[in-house]
Amino acid sequence: LKGKVSGVQITQSSGQPNSDSKVRIRGIGTVNNSDPLYIVDGMPVGGGINYLNPTDIASIEILKDAASAAIYGARAANGVVLVTTKSGSKGKTTVSYDFSYGWQNPWKKKAVLNAHEYMTIMNEMQINDGNAPRYSAADIANNMVDTDWQDEVFNYDAPVQQHQLSINGGNDKMTYFLSLGYFNQEGIVGGNYGRSNYERLSVRSNSTYKVFEVEDRKYLNAVTVGVNLGYTRDHSTSVEANSEYGSILGSAIAFSPLVPVYASEEEGESILASYPNAIVKDGKVLSLPPSGFQELTNPVAQLNRPTLGRNNSYKIVGTFYAELNILPGLKFRSSYGVDLAFWGYDGYGYPDYLGTMTHTDASWVQSEMNRGMRWQTENYFSYNQTFAE
């Protein structure tokens, strides 16, 4: 939709896999919530439409003006996004399978100081404060450490894959559309450590069935029932995003290039003697930050912390309806929709030490589960007739 609908702004909240897209219709409506109302197959859903498999979507319509959105009341104050999923069609049963596999890379690195530039600017700072230079000319000339922390944390060629299986068909009596989708994305920061990943499994069944249809009768001559039912299971892990200080990317940009990723063997032994919970990878101790770096720590050590948490989400959205032809042009429709969601978090951690302001002193474990449900029932008549054509 981005760039295709006037007056609609769509931005991604972060580069995290499956990060929400912010949709703004007619600008920002309120301070706390400017999200539009999402309607999927006639059912208002909470939490956006990230749960949907994009290949299951047949059409998306945006209601921007107050008149067209008036039927939804105050809920439509920020606009309405109408989503219609695919339905079956008459004809032979068709089975299709689609597969895609690709790679992702950071499109740009932040320009930061290398080791030589860093020592030079630090000396200038010391001199401007009336102090002696921190690094001598020999230190600058003989320095052998020049760590590019962005290269150390970026997960280059992070894979993303998608599988889609669908079955479509029908006859004069019924139509059906069935789909099974799987999507997996590895994040470009922390994805190779299992810390920034997204996995979605989706199942959909849309069907209609004509209970009866009598062509030679003008009243009560047809009844149609239908079911649109979708289930989605999401699993995701994430790193801290949009944070200047203390996060993995924040440290990768601001941390000193003079600090090596791993401490020397002698220094590593000294670190473990003072801090037994320091991070060790492949038998090597990851460097600790020098004094004065406050919350900034070795970003590679952050990726190797003995902690891990996963967000879980399970969502079922269904619409059940029946439609009766009463008279020519006059129909009655009754529908019931439900949005049932379960979401939670499971995580654990062990004691660790990354710096004076970043450490965990005790093991912990956490598990939570939430449930939310909304339902809607609609009963209405519609009349469609053309006069004096």
Predicted regions and their residues:
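Short, small/polar-rich motifs associated with maturation and membrane association
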Residues: 1-205, 209-225, 317-318
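Surface-exposed loop/interface segments of Gram-negative outer-membrane beta-barrel transport/assembly proteins
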Residues: 90-146, 190-198, 202, 208-315, ...
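An active-site-proximal structural segment forming one wall of the substrate-binding cleft
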Residues: 330
